[in-house]
């Protein structure tokens, strides 16, 4: 079974930390990744070279890899240039996630970046992190293998919107126009939500904050209990 079919109807757990986040430590994240796999996670979404290296030493599951890198001349920070792609290929991640919004990139535009990747690494699976239907259609046309809703609400154009509003309307809209497998990511907090999303025909769901960001989980509980 190929990897894309293998991850159908599965829970993908995002296990990431950067900057001053309290769990931003390769050893800590490797232990968390081990616990996630112990609990049944069959795919992980990971960022940053050292973290991915550490996790790969303790678990053997498919990895969706990305590198978060900020450049002064662009808002795009998820695997923004070919340099980050090269690093991820060297790490042998199974799928590379890239920002696939229509925003200005720090180096090549998205069209040329994808062309470069497909020339250098023709067998590399690519996942498009999108914020809008327009992003998703463009990414599909460029040849991305998977389309994700990761950046919904994270761009100026989609600020204030999310994947859950209006009974998952954005995900429903994607289903109408996207033929590639769709990955739902962003704002999913409960197993019930994940199940409802999968029942829409979405390929799989990614959950990060609700499982792996302990400070956010405690805040979520406290906000409800107030």
Swiss-Prot record:
GO MF annotations in UniProt: N-acylglucosamine-6-phosphate 2-epimerase activity
Keywords from the named record: Carbohydrate metabolism, Isomerase
Enzyme's top EC category: isomerase
GO biological process assignments: carbohydrate metabolic process; N-acetylmannosamine catabolic process; N-acetylneuraminate catabolic process
Pathway linked to the protein: Amino-sugar metabolism; N-acetylneuraminate degradation; D-fructose 6-phosphate from N-acetylneuraminate: step 3/5
Enzyme Commission code: 5.1.3.9
Entry GO CC: cytosol
Highest taxon above the source species: Bacteria
Role summary: Converts N-acetylmannosamine-6-phosphate (ManNAc-6-P) to N-acetylglucosamine-6-phosphate (GlcNAc-6-P).
Name the record gives this protein: Putative N-acetylmannosamine-6-phosphate 2-epimerase
Organism encoding this protein: Mycoplasma capricolum subsp. capricolum (strain California kid / ATCC 27343 / NCTC 10154)
Gene: nanE
């Amino acid at each position: 079974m190929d990897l894309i079919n293998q991850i159908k109807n599965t829970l993908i757990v995002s296990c990431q930390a950067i900057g001053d986040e309290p769990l931003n430590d390769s050893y800590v994240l490797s232990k968390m990744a081990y616990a996630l796999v112990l609990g049944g996670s069959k795919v992980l979404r990971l960022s940053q070279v050292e973290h991915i290296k550490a996790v790969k030493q303790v678990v053997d599951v498919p990895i969706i890899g990305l590198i978060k890198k900020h450049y002064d001349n662009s808002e795009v920070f998820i695997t923004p240039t070919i340099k980050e792609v090269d690093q991820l290929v060297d790490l042998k991640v199974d799928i590379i996630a890239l920002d696939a919004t229509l925003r200005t990139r720090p180096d090549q535009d998205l069209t040329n970046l994808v062309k470069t990747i497909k020339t250098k690494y023709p067998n590399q699976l690519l996942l498009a992190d999108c914020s809008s239907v327009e992003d998703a259609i463009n990414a599909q046309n460029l040849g991305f293998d998977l389309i994700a809703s990761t950046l919904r609400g994270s761009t100026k154009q989609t600020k204030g919107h999310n994947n859950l509003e209006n009974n998952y309307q954005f995900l429903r809209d994607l289903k109408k126009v996207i033929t590639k497998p769709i990955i739902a990511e962003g704002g999913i907090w409960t197993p019930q939500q994940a199940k409802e999303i999968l029942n829409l025909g979405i390929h799989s769901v990614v959950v990060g904050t609700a499982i792996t960001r302990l400070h956010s989980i405690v805040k979520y509980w406290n906000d409800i209990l107030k």
